């Protein structure tokens, strides 16, 4: 489930569907077009992704279990993708190469991409991510 709170907008709820073959297939196509160039074809990310480059930017992290994507609830993943990390953490000068996908991808497309990413994780990681989502939901996140 994805919860996004935008200024002057109602709280929006989306449900990731990593078990829906149509959604996952759609997400795979969008991922290949919009994400794979930086995050890798299989979500492996860029090397040295924890260290800022000479340009001051962090390389794209992996979306596979070796990265931290699954450490974040769906609501944060959706917000980072749509609005950018700087807005999420309220630090407008935060340097990142991650594009903002608001007005580039629809909410449905963002959910499909996130569903595809989650569908790639092994069952134990998906279970842990579901637990993170449940804790976030209970805390009102």
What are these regions (language model features)?
Residues 1-3, 116:
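Extended surface/linker regions that mediate inter-domain or inter-protein docking
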Residues 28, 44-78, 97-105:
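Gly/Gly-Pro-rich "capping" loops immediately C-terminal to redox-active cysteine motifs
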